[in-house]
């Protein structure tokens, strides 16, 4: 019998972690992963359903797999809208929602029974990872308690469920032992970690720690590898972790989605509504940790956004001088409360505001990177091509931030650290020469 499984993972890093866990279980039970539809006995597709374009990509992928294989199991965020999937592809074998690991594995069992004698010893202790060996995503919770009007994640993934502290730290240790040099801490709401447990006290390596954001960061910092924080909601207690960055326990990098600067728009989004307070906090963080890199994301064209309110966002951007910024044009997501707001912004205006926003940020980024010329940066080697080395600095998360390009020399390996002298820059990337390897 064919025990081969095809797997397609769509969407964000949180979905990628879900895929890794499903694949780890399947591999532990003796299934073989194959890269083509035609070789697979069944195909699993982990979908995204956050915005319309993601829904369409997921549906297109399901249709393609059905056409080329015909035996398809669907899971992930779009699985919460089973009727949408069934209307497009009525013959899929099974549909489940996000983080339904056991349900997916059971569905595979039903339609493609496992081998009688799985070679479980072939599974590494850290599980199967879909990222390069030197970095890994570490998911610390599921779900979200926020009620942002533009988002339906709580509907698809449920309320906050923090993973046990010992489970997270054990996984982190195994990843380090497997050679991982960088942990990217992710969840729907990273800084809310532990709220649902009422900060339960647990024992870890002979000491008592609280199930809360600060304690988790402190314990991860003791691993001695890069720890990068993503999706950090701007709660007041986020201020407490900045000294950990200053002291080198975790990377001086904070991914903190702010979404807008105008107070009326923020209230309509049900987000923290004080750009003045945010600017004061940013100044405080930089005073405590001058090397901190601040990344954020914003939405332009939110329903009712006026030209004056958009101009306020641009003014905030210029004053905040954030290091890394992403921007999204508002997209009405089925089920989001923001869809009911008056005065939707036209697509032409959204597009125009998006380009104006990105022009402002490109200039900010260009000037910030120009100031790094002549400095020495610790970099992590991501890739070595025929003629160059591609790396990232402490300021750069994989996939979403800039890169450091270096001339190729011998003795450097992917996943190693090195010191690089920066000689040039552009809008988003740095260029330099290797000074020496840190191994």
UniProtKB/Swiss-Prot annotation:
Its main location: cytoplasm. It is an enzyme of class 2 (transferase). It is found in: Cytoplasm. It comes from the Bacteria. Residues 3-113 form the MTTase N-terminal domain. It catalyses: L-aspartate(89)-[ribosomal protein uS12]-hydrogen + (sulfur carrier)-SH + AH2 + 2 S-adenosyl-L-methionine = 3-methylsulfanyl-L-aspartate(89)-[ribosomal protein uS12]-hydrogen + (sulfur carrier)-H + 5'-deoxyadenosine + L-methionine + A + S-adenosyl-L-homocysteine + 2 H(+). GO terms for molecular function: 4 iron, 4 sulfur cluster binding; aspartic acid methylthiotransferase activity; metal ion binding; protein methylthiotransferase activity. One of its GO terms (biological process) is tRNA modification. This is Ribosomal protein uS12 methylthiotransferase RimO. It comes from Legionella pneumophila (strain Corby). The lineage of its organism: Bacteria, Pseudomonadati, Pseudomonadota, Gammaproteobacteria, Legionellales. The gene is rimO.
